[in-house]
Swiss-Prot record:
Name of a matching Pfam family: RuBisCO_large
Binding locations of Mg(2+): K167, D169, E170
Species assigned in the record: Convolvulus tricolor (Dwarf morning glory)
Name of protein: Ribulose bisphosphate carboxylase large chain
Primary site of residence: plastid
Amino acid sequence: DILAAFRVTPQPGVPPEEAGAAVAAESSTGTWTTVWTDGLTNLDRYKGRCYRXXRVIGEKDQFIAYVAYPLDLFEEGSVTNMFTSIVGNVFGFKALRXLRLEDLRIPPAYVKTFQGPPHGIQVERDKLNKYGRPLLGCTIKPKLGLSAKNYGRAVYECLRGGLDFTKDDENVNSQPFMRWRDRFLFCAEAIYKAQAETGEIKGHYLNATAGTCEDMNKRAVFARELGVPIVMHDYLTGGFTANTSLAHYCRDNGLLLHIHRAMHAVIDRQKSHGMHFRVLAKALRMSGGDHIHAGTVVGKLEGEREITLGFVDLLRDDLVEQDRSRGIYFTQDWVSLPGVLPVASGGIHVWHMPALTEIFGDDSVLQFGGGTLGHPWGNAPGAVANRVALEACVQARNEGRDLAREGNEIIREACKWSPELAAACEVWKEIRFEFKPVDTLDPDEKK
């Protein structure tokens, strides 16, 4: 069975057992009345069952309802069908004030019907010939308004300065100021020139997201013809059907696939209603993507540390044990489905490098947009500053130093032999994003 954990807030007077049963029925075989065609099938075989309800400590009107869905309810290899069944209609149920899908347990038999990421972590490292450290990226800013040639120039400066990747922002598609084909051509030129100068393999996340699947595929085909290593997709606004199709194309044609989660906070940010990002992360691993944005913990975007580390493990690891202290409701066995690199991006700069290296580890992508392009000396020095800071943190960690305790000291030491890093540290020494997260663990989940 597929197991689901729902946070249920029923209307006053609706008992938890009745609300849980209603969720199970509405998201499987049930309707609002008895129908004569019920007698034409075996409902016991197909109906969802609420097998447990547990109150949320500290919330008098909330409880967690655990629901089991028989596998025969779902089309093989279709995230679209899975979500249409489990969350498609029940969230508008009048008997509930709020409903949130906290987690899913996907059984191995169903996982095996998905291709998953086009390539996975190890294949990506082998393609790029880069090991033993996080990968470095940068989102080109301003995200909108640049001409294709100026955009390509910014890409080149960042890549030659030491970054592994640059990136289209999520809303860069094919606008009047920069059509997609022109952008692809100038970015490919920048990649090849930077590779020739540095001797390293470089990439730019060319956003293939489009208004139709046909246009999306056309852009991916052109990227392959240019010989670039990676394309990008906005998987929530683009949709799971389009994403899975693109992932299959990328595997067949040797392209890596970067995934942006634009629109996720509309779905996952409120604690009492919607869907937790760990569910969206699991769905992406099944649908297919080699990278996905996962918050930063320390930057400008929402993300509590333990919760973030929980879904980062769900993206990368083969087996993740149940751990309520990190918000993981079920043990998840991925049965060797390739892993996804989490991407830390959003309001981060060189002073965050020790914390990011310690939190996310080697199998991650650290992306500094403003933290590269905002360098007072230009894009290439900004890239140099980030690369020096990363190499210093990785070396210090490998020497046994504590990045959490000695991080600032490690960065200051590196500043002595890198004027680019010293300038970056001076610019961003006062920047903080100290706001309490909205989505936090429940009291009974914390150790």
